[in-house]
Amino acid sequence: MQLKALLEPLVTRMGYQLWGMEFRVAKHSALLRLFIDSEQGITLDDCTEVSRQVSALMDVEDPIQVPYTLEVSSPGVDRPLFEAGQYARYVGEQVRVRTQWPIDGQRNFAGAIVSADEDSVTLDVDGREVRLPLEAIARGRLKGTLPPATQVEE
């Protein structure tokens, strides 16, 4: 069973969206990172509770055969993008994308999302449109911007 198919129903039942997941294997260990989201935002307590529930399920199902660390967090301001619908949700926003292989001689792209469908994402990179097949995208991330700090008058 795929990890997403195992974990997404649990996270959804808890009232959260499984925004995405990363699984990285190093020489002697692995890291499973889950990104959760909700309309109300995510707190540290939310992450802790999801971590507890996911850990219990993983102990029973045992889908990972190497020692691993589980991390649960919110996607944050510069949230990673995993699926076509996530790119479509942020049309007009600035992103950074790295591809698995060169496209037009490069692998790193930064620009605004023009459009996204189930097959590709189109970016405006310095005034030219670049179409990136979803299967080519290794990593995509919003270029997050924080709102300006409000000044407190004394």
Curated annotation (Swiss-Prot):
Compartment(s) of residence: Cytoplasm
Alphabetized Gene3D superfamilies for the sequence: Ribosome maturation factor RimP, C-terminal domain, RimP-like superfamily, N-terminal
GO-annotated cellular components: cytosol
Residues passing through the membrane, by range: none
Keyword Transferase listed: no
Origin: domain of life: Bacteria
GO annotation, biological process: ribosomal small subunit assembly; translation
Keyword set includes Secreted: no
Disulfide bridges in this chain: none
Predominant subcellular localization, coarse grouping: cytoplasm
Keywords: Cytoplasm, Ribosome biogenesis
Classification via CDD domains: YlxS_C (cd01734)
Protein function: Required for maturation of 30S ribosomal subunits.
Similarity comment: family membership: Belongs to the RimP family.
Name of the protein in its database record: Ribosome maturation factor RimP
Originating species: Thioalkalivibrio sulfidiphilus (strain HL-EbGR7)
Lineage of producing organism: Bacteria, Pseudomonadati, Pseudomonadota, Gammaproteobacteria, Chromatiales
